[in-house]
Amino acid sequence: MTDSEPQTLNNNSEITANHNDDILEYLSVDDYDYELPDQLIARYPLAQRSASKLLYLPTNNANSQVEDKLFSELPDILNAGDLIVFNDTKVMKARLFGQKDTGGKIEVLIERLVSLSDVNSAYLDEIIANSKTIDTTIIAEKHIALCHIKASKALKLGQGLVLADGHMTGIMIGRQENLFILAFDTPILPDLEQYGELPIPPYFERHADATDNTRYQTVFHDPAKLASVAAPTASLHFDDIVLEKLAAKGIQTAFVTLHVGAGTFAPVKTDNLLNHTMHSEYAHLPQATAELINQTHANGKQVIAIGTTVTRVLETAYQQTAVDGQSLSGWSGDTDIFIYPGFKFGVVDKLLTNFHLPKSTLLMLVSAFATKKSIEQAYQHAIKSQYRFFSYGDAMLLDKQVD
């Protein structure tokens, strides 16, 4: 199998978390709540990427305790022959502002581009016949997107909108669950890069600025993979200095892709985790990366996932492709994997991640990886020690642990 012919998954409902049914603790969303002083929310990045702090949770043993370190010390913790796996996605300038054709203000967040064939043709024919906003005869591939909408009144089918001071015009041509399907009369991605705003997290409580355009992207993103609406934030700590130190020590690097959706910020709205519907995101594990992972484990070395996005890709691919629970193969498709305590990890040995929002699926994932008790203690220590939280905050390095 080659990278150009990955295994695909057309029905993401087939992806089910590999949980131990005997573990029924920590299924209430309230189990993942905590109080965070507002001043510990990092709303701006540090001057240097790798200047952040690093809280290390080593493998549990009788004397195991958290260790306070600097992120620049990461190469000293890892061993030659270990493999670091990054997410090489790039964040779109996906936020747009403008007006509906009725004059009301509107905010649009592009979630992902979709194909013309995904749109109900009956809708499209009717809208083309009645549209007064845009020339719908030139709607084509790369002109249609699933979007989140903020407006005083809901956008109606066939309603037009004018965005970015008139540089972009569009029309609502359908719905997909809680998302709106918008069609534009020009290709979307070039317009976003010129007129859009980087969709920094809502808890920053500000608009994106020029610094964010650089610092809310990883240094190794692939420009061709412009499709995320949030950064893989664990990777934001890496700069050329740290990458060079890792290479000098003989630590390998590889890449996967997961295009991060706005669902990463969505709260869990059900009291019981088992009733939560996980958002879906496109993911890709190249065959070359799968082979490196297989070889790393065969050599007795560790695979380090940089962030929850990488973890979700690798563990999804493990469920879909691993032969006898061992060898991975290349894979691509949509993943809606939901990882919470009781999950049995098949690939990841260490996880580098940031500190996550209360009651979030990301906090549930790290609790599954390092145990709920260890994460609670680590967060208490981090708050007491004035660590910086969330996307621009400090990092944690977790060893896979078991209760």
UniProtKB/Swiss-Prot annotation:
Catalytic activity: 7-aminomethyl-7-carbaguanosine(34) in tRNA + S-adenosyl-L-methionine = epoxyqueuosine(34) in tRNA + adenine + L-methionine + 2 H(+)
Domain of life of the native organism: Bacteria
Span of the signal peptide: none
Keyword Cell division: no
Gene3D superfamilies, per database record: QueA-like
GO BP field: queuosine biosynthetic process; tRNA wobble guanine modification
Any GO molecular function: S-adenosylmethionine:tRNA ribosyltransferase-isomerase activity
Pathway per the UniProt entry: tRNA modification; tRNA-queuosine biosynthesis
Name of the featured protein: S-adenosylmethionine:tRNA ribosyltransferase-isomerase
Species the sequence originates in: Psychrobacter arcticus (strain DSM 17307 / VKM B-2377 / 273-4)
